[in-house]
Regions:
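Post-transcriptional modification and biogenesis factors for structured RNAs
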Residues: 1-140
Length: 140
């Protein structure tokens, strides 16, 4: 049986720090996150996020990762929580679709598992993510 409680809008706003437009809120248990090894086992394309502190940026990156066919996202502890309200909203739910987990600052394991490092940039010399040289890489 699902328990439900009611509260005055002002009380709910005080609990959450937000004025809830429809007066509904819920609390859920977070799923246990998989290990980095589990996430990367069959992945070919992995995004590693470091020091992304704005929730909207985290959500946008997850949404872009889904559009670009990224297999998994590894989030360093210096980043905003991908499950915070704004990140989830901006991600349009893709944070629940793309496998992700936290990774410590040491990313050497990725190289040991055959991943090559690439960075994304908006500049004249940048190549498309669909570039044949990048596509030929087994793990990126």
């Amino acid at each position: 049986m699902l328990q439900s409680y009611t509260g005055d809008r002002d009380v709910l706003a005080g609990l959450t720090g937000y004025k809830l437009t429809r007066g509904i809120l819920c609390a859920m248990r977070r799923p246990r996150l998989p290990s980095v090894q589990q996430i990367c086992f069959q992945a070919r394309r992995v995004a590693v996020l470091d020091n992304i502190t704005d929730a909207a940026n985290i959500g946008g990156i997850f949404r872009s990762a889904a559009a670009l066919g990224v297999d998994a996202v590894l989030v360093m502890r210096s980043c905003c929580d991908p499950l915070c309200r704004k990140a989830v909203r901006v991600s349009m739910g893709t944070v629940f679709q793309i496998p992700w987990t936290y990774i410590e600052n040491n990313v050497k394991e990725l190289g040991e598992w055959g991943f090559k490092t690439a960075a994304m940039a908006l500049c004249e010399h940048a190549v498309s993510i669909d570039d044949q040289a990048l596509m030929a890489e087994g793990r990126l």
